[in-house]
Amino acid sequence: MDFPSRFDVIVIGGGHAGTEAALASARMGVKTLLLTHNVETLGHMSCNPAIGGIGKSHLVKEIDALGGAMALATDKSGIQFRVLNNRKGPAVRATRAQADRAIYKAVVREILENQPNLWIFQQSCDDLIVEQDQVKGVVTQMGLRFFAESVVLTTGTFLGGLIHIGLQNHSGGRAGDPPSIALAHRMRELPLRVGRLKTGTPPRIDGRSVDFSVMTEQPGDTPIPVMSFMGNAEMHPRQVSCWITHTNARTHEIIASNLDRSPMYSGVIEGVGPRYCPSIEDKIHRFADKESHQVFIEPEGLNTHELYPNGISTSLPFDVQLELVRSIRGMENAHIVRPGYAIEYDYFDPRDLKYSLETKVIGGLFFAGQINGTTGYEEAGAQGLLAGTNAALRAQGRDSWCPRRDEAYIGVLVDDLITLGTQEPYRMFTSRAEYRLILREDNADLRLTEKGRELGLIDDLRWAAFCAKRDGIEREEQRLKSTWVRPNTEQGQAVVDKFGTPLSHEYSLLNLLARPEIDYAGLIEATGGEAIDPQVAEQVEIRTKYAGYIDRQQDEIARLRASEDTRLPVDIDYTTISGLSKEIQGKLSQTRPETLGQASRIPGVTPAAISLMLIHLKKRGAGRELEQSA
């Protein structure tokens, strides 16, 4: 057979996790196979047509900083861009983009098809080849065998997928796609903890049947933001508005009177749904005192009339869906193009994973995306990139890598998953990170791109752009530091006139910029400086104004890092540690944390227990620093 059967890395699944995993592995120079059940659905946005949002855009920027495709695909397909929390500090600002679903998918496919070292093959995976607790390859639906020392599973909602509309259900990976039944059975044979989760989607509406005149228009931002560090607004297609309407008492009455026909409330669905993206049934049940809920009407694309009514995800029967949709202002005559539905699927307890996202029990088998209990394109893409990177590192005989919690939201995501596990679909928020001021959207490249270059993820073009930005920041900060403004001079008076800030003595421009009332653009205008790259200017201003807070956070990180990175021996027997309660011994034995820091975040493990473990390690002489290569 001319088609190769042996690869370094095999990725199963072509969604957001799978595409980033395959691209990362191939960028690192290893021979990579991407197996997908349908080439036409590579990069498909299964749920809402949007990328980013609070916490999520930080992940997108980090994927981008490591050379991933999601941000650039968003810039090329985004039909509306907004910065959320714009009036708050830079740590919690977040970019969100509506994407043209068809363009996004086409861009991702183009990137995949033009990636060296990457083979794409359309076949479902039905079996894993495992020998002596090591993965050796996969078997496809038609019996083809492909071999690799590293396999990345990114199965999304396809493992044992069951679609519910009302009290009727049928097998499916998502609407229109078959589930992975054979692989689900095979996975349940492995010594891994498995559970069921649920997610859902709203009915899609024909925009020609909607009255926008009674809704509130929500235009995008001007100037238009960009998502990728390599992107620009000229990449964006035509920009459009979203619209806002609301449910009402009649809507809630329709839903409440039909809860007995809901698969969620009649006990048909066993899986737990996402807390932060609840169905409309959940909303009116959990928030019974609320008179209305917002519904965001989002366009699916520039060349379709289809709309996505964000906020009314439902699995109620179709007749109820039609009635509740038509009870909403502006949608009294709405035509439903596709019914909403819920889907149940298998996921595996992420506490059975290492930091590399490799399973603890099967060597070379990596998990990424919804199989780990997460929800969202961004969370999936971040895990996919990390799993693909570590699968490639394993193939190259190099140490694995995962950023720490103080280095990236990706690090927060992975640490939360493998330490705490999850009983419901996990979504990223900025509130999950202790070091938000350092882990900003705007500095993701400064935090991660150098590491990405070292790993082999960053091409020459991106590296040159990054170096120019980094060096530009250093030059401008030095210029501001060495440029002085004195009272009663032309420059000094210009500053006073511009900001109403009296100068009692001479100041460097850097000192002046640290003042809350002085902004960078105004300071340059007043003192006659030259315009510089906007990304450089943004970094200089943020770093200067928040320098004191950032320094304090860095000091805190340095203090904690010594114990945080102390590695726990793989063979440690917690029952031999004097003073540990049986409960804590059990928790530690079950989770098998890799570091003392990870152990400290296991619920129920007390600071006193950590001290006892540290004493035990010192006695053994086994404590050594983990350079995040577990």
UniProtKB/Swiss-Prot annotation:
One GO biological process term: tRNA methylation
Name of one Pfam family that matches: GIDA
PROSITE patterns: GIDA_1 (PS01280), GIDA_2 (PS01281)
Keywords: Cytoplasm, FAD, Flavoprotein, NAD, tRNA processing
Gene3D superfamilies to which the protein is assigned, alphabetical: FAD/NAD(P)-binding domain, GidA associated domain, C-terminal subdomain, tRNA uridine 5-carboxymethylaminomethyl modification enzyme MnmG/GidA
InterPro entries hit by this protein: FAD/NAD-bd_sf (IPR036188), GIDA_C_N (IPR049312), MnmG (IPR004416), MnmG-rel (IPR002218), MnmG-rel_CS (IPR020595), MnmG_C (IPR026904), MnmG_C_subdom (IPR047001), MnmG_C_subdom_sf (IPR044920)
Molecular function GO labels: flavin adenine dinucleotide binding
Coiled-coil boundaries: none
Keyword Glycoprotein belongs to the record: no
Positions contributing to FAD binding: G13, G14, G15, H16, A17, G18
Binding, NAD(+): 273-287
Cofactors demanded by this protein: FAD
Location relative to the cell: Cytoplasm
Role of this protein: NAD-binding protein involved in the addition of a carboxymethylaminomethyl (cmnm) group at the wobble position (U34) of certain tRNAs, forming tRNA-cmnm(5)s(2)U34.
Name of the protein in question: tRNA uridine 5-carboxymethylaminomethyl modification enzyme MnmG
Gene: mnmG
